[in-house]
Amino acid sequence: MPQMAPLNWAMMTIMFSLSLLVSMIILYSNFNSTPPTKMKMKTSQKLIWKW
């Protein structure tokens, strides 16, 4: 099925970029948070909603 190959590749790329974005957000919130975990959760949620 040659027609399905580009679609699968696009889906894989999209999923990879999404996971990369999520991991970057998590890393960013981890590096930027000196307050306790509750605040960290709040900020990460805010970041996710912003995206």
From Swiss-Prot:
Keywords, sorted A to Z: ATP synthesis, CF(0), Hydrogen ion transport, Ion transport, Membrane, Mitochondrion, Transmembrane, Transmembrane helix, Transport
Q: What is its main location?
A: mitochondrion
Q: Where in the cell is it found?
A: Mitochondrion membrane
Q: What InterPro entries does the entry give?
A: ATP8_metazoa (IPR001421)
Note whether Cell inner membrane occurs among the keywords. no
GO CC annotations, alphabetized:
mitochondrial membrane; proton-transporting ATP synthase complex
The portions of this protein that span the membrane are 7-27
* Disulfide bond residue pairs: none
The leader peptide range reads none
Named from the GO MF annotations, one term is: proton transmembrane transporter activity
Give the bilayer topology: Single-pass membrane protein
Q: Does the keyword Membrane apply?
A: yes
One protein family per Pfam: ATP-synt_8
Q: Give the GO terms filed under biological process for this record.
A: proton motive force-driven ATP synthesis
Subunit organization: F-type ATPases have 2 components, CF(1) - the catalytic core - and CF(0) - the membrane proton channel.
Functionally, this protein is described as follows:
Mitochondrial membrane ATP synthase (F(1)F(0) ATP synthase or Complex V) produces ATP from ADP in the presence of a proton gradient across the membrane which is generated by electron transport complexes of the respiratory chain. F-type ATPases consist of two structural domains, F(1) - containing the extramembraneous catalytic core and F(0) - containing the membrane proton channel, linked together by a central stalk and a peripheral stalk. During catalysis, ATP synthesis in the catalytic domain of F(1) is coupled via a rotary mechanism of the central stalk subunits to proton translocation.
The family annotation for this protein states: Belongs to the ATPase protein 8 family.
Name of the protein this chain belongs to: ATP synthase protein 8
